[in-house]
């Protein structure tokens, strides 16, 4: 059984499409969708309920707390982490299962593609994920937090997520904590289409810099450098 976990903070503009992209991918597979209401003040929970999925609340603000709440309530043996402002692409589930059902694989992750992105952003995104794939093989493990599937047994072995990292680097820390249990595969065909809102509002250079320095810090020092983050809605 696959448990799809979607952390949400005021995602009324995106959550319906996100949920429906998951449902359209499911055939002949047991699954559940858990939307984690992380202090929403809009209609996110109402819309999720209309879509007939499980909605739970997590009052501690932050994506890592929402992921942990989803994991603790999940019934499946596979945990799929999906960002609320994303839509998984056709065939996503089967691409993920092809990798993660191997005995030596504990997690699979893939790239994000951004809606209505410029040619320069598309090029930089391709370069980023090329570098991420190289890093995953030779430097440090790479995990795209909002576009991944993890065996629940691997998370059970480390008691879930590290709650000391609020945002930047939380996915890298997850990868770092479970990597001794098996392989983490970067699968280029495991694509999720995401909103570019953070890049648009924060700027491309700053966004890349913040993710890069925190990835390196968590990989080599075991801690994040940036504790503060801004919600972009």
Model segments located where?
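Short, acidic, metal-binding catalytic loop of nucleotide-sugar glycosyltransferases
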Residues: 20-30
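Glycine-rich, basic loop-to-helix element that forms the pyrophosphate-binding segment
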Residues: 58-74
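Short aromatic/hydrophobic "clamp" motif used to bind/position activated sugar donors
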Residues: 79
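Acidic helix N-cap motif at the loop->helix transition within catalytic regions
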Residues: 14-16, 42-50
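Short, flexible, basic/aromatic active-site loop/helix in glycosyltransferases
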Residues: 109-117, 121-145
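Conserved donor NDP-sugar-binding/catalytic core segment of glycosyltransferases
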Residues: 91-120
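Acidic donor-binding loop at a coil-to-helix junction in glycosyltransferase catalytic cores
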Residues: 167-174
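A conserved acidic beta->alpha catalytic loop
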Residues: 37-45, 86
């Amino acid at each position: 059984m696959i448990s799809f976990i979607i952390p949400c903070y005021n995602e009324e503009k995106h959550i319906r499409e996100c949920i429906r992209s998951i449902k359209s991918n499911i055939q002949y597979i047991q699954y559940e969708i858990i939307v984690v209401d992380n202090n929403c003040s809009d209609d996110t929970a109402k819309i999720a309920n209309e879509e007939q999925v499980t909605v739970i609340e997590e009052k501690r603000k932050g994506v890592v707390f929402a992921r942990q709440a989803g994991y603790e309530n999940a019934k499946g043996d596979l945990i799929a982490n999906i960002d609320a402002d994303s839509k998984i692409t056709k065939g996503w589930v089967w691409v993920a299962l092809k990798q993660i059902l191997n005995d030596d694989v504990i997690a699979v992750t893939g790239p994000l593609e951004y809606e209505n992105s410029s040619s320069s952003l598309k090029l930089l995104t391709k370069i980023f994920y090329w570098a991420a794939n190289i890093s995953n093989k030779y430097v440090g493990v790479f995990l795209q937090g909002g576009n991944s599937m993890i065996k629940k047994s691997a998370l059970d072995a480390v008691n879930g997520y590290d709650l000391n990292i609020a945002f930047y680097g939380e996915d890298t820390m997850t990868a770092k904590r479970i990597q001794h249990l098996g392989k983490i595969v970067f699968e280029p065909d495991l694509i999720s289409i995401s909103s570019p809102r953070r890049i648009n509002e924060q700027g491309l250079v700053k966004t890349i810099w913040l993710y890069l320095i925190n990835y390196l810090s968590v990989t080599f020092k075991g801690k994040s450098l940036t504790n503060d983050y801004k919600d972009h809605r």
